[in-house]
Amino acid sequence: MGKLHSKHAAICKARESPEGDSFVVNACLARKGLDDWMVKQKYYCSSSRVDQRDCQQKNNCELSPRDPLDEGYAEGISDEHYRLEVALPPEKTDSCSVEERMQGTEGSATVGPHKQLQFEELECAVSVEEDNRQEWTFTLYDFDNNGKVTREDITSLLHTIYEVVDASVNHSPSSSKTLRVKLSVAPDSSQRWKNCTQTNTDTPNPKHKGEKCIEDSKTSEKKSRAFLRRYHAEHHSQQGCQRHCVDENLERRNHYLDLAGIENYTSRFGTAAPATEPAKPTHATRSSNQSRSRSQEPENGQVHPAHHRRSQTMSTDPPAILTRHTHALRSPKTHRTPPTQASAGRVMRRGAPPPPSVPNQTPPHQSSGPYRRHKQRPKEALHYRALGPSVTSGPVLEKEHVRDLPSLVLYEGGLAQVVQRHEHHHHHEHHHHYHHFYQS
């Protein structure tokens, strides 16, 4: 039936390597020892029969493609056994000593019973550099000998590994092969020790030149420490930057809130401002200026036609009066005044100005003629019907203050307009009533 259609071909697949023909073996290390594992690998690669017990070992062998016209095809497989690349997955064991892994090998230098070299993981890799040279790399992870590892321990361990490898490799009588055994020991995470040594010795075997060395794990530790140092430095710098940014944002937000005047907005406009309150600096936002100018549109519409008939003079009132005046303009009650209320307010201001101490229960137009009383009654009815019970003495007193002031300064878009309310209303109602007097 042939090798390509047998059970062996099911787990052995052809592979082309750019370096040439090679044989790749992935195997799990048995606890019986390295010798049993090497015997099994040699049996898999030299035989075509694989039973069910061997399939459970999860060994994958890949045969490189060869010329089918080659007469020595079976001999080529035995020759290819020298070209091995073994990648062992790490196997975690519970305190497995080197004696248990290395027992049963002929001529092996056993470690003394008082020496219990323990390691958690073992990794073995074999690479083929040339036709007559192989390199075997063993890595022991979490290697610990109670924190005391001597040169003799490492040397005996390396000799044991080399004898196991030498016994597992087929020797060709016609050619010599160089085996390089490399041992890497990674220290235990709980212990920091650096007693790893490196040895390079040749074996007395005339057919093989053994090169033995030990890799120190200082480079890996330096890399890990540098990585941790860099991580901590970046972490601390990021924390400092974030803290600085948060403080800067809070200061900027408080500064903008102070500029907008939002902190004391409700306490400032909830009740009438006292006369002793200092004047607020004129750094209000432009949107608030526009909203205040829109609230005065019914009065500003009558201000502009008569504004060119009088000179523009700057107000020289005391600070207390200006403060009360600006608060009367900024009051939310004034913002919500409907047009009927504004017109009624103008009607109430048409009469003679009463003294400031007189309350506003008495209508100010009683001293006028009968035609004024007749025309102002429906407007007063509409005014009191629109206001209802919400009319209090607060806005009325504020309007009295506004009427008594000789001039008013409004800021809109950076341009100052001097509006003389009292003089304007005097001219306007004189012209208006003069016209009505002649019509009637």
Curated annotation (Swiss-Prot):
Residues 324-336, 422-440 have a biased composition (Basic residues). Residues 129-164 form the EF-hand domain. Keywords: Calcium, Cell membrane, Cytoplasm, Lipoprotein, Membrane, Metal-binding, Myristate, Wnt signaling pathway. GO terms for molecular function: calcium ion binding. GO terms for biological process: embryonic heart tube left/right pattern formation; eye photoreceptor cell differentiation; heart jogging; Kupffer's vesicle development; left/right pattern formation; negative regulation of canonical Wnt signaling pathway; negative regulation of protein import into nucleus; negative regulation of Wnt signaling pathway. Its main location: membrane. A lipid is attached at G2 (N-myristoyl glycine). Signal peptide: none annotated. Residues 352-362 have a biased composition (Pro residues). Residues 272-293 have a biased composition (Low complexity). Residues 192-204 have a biased composition (Polar residues). Belongs to the NKD family. Cell autonomous antagonist of the canonical Wnt signaling pathway. May activate a second Wnt signaling pathway that controls planar cell polarity. This is Protein naked cuticle homolog 1. The gene is nkd1.
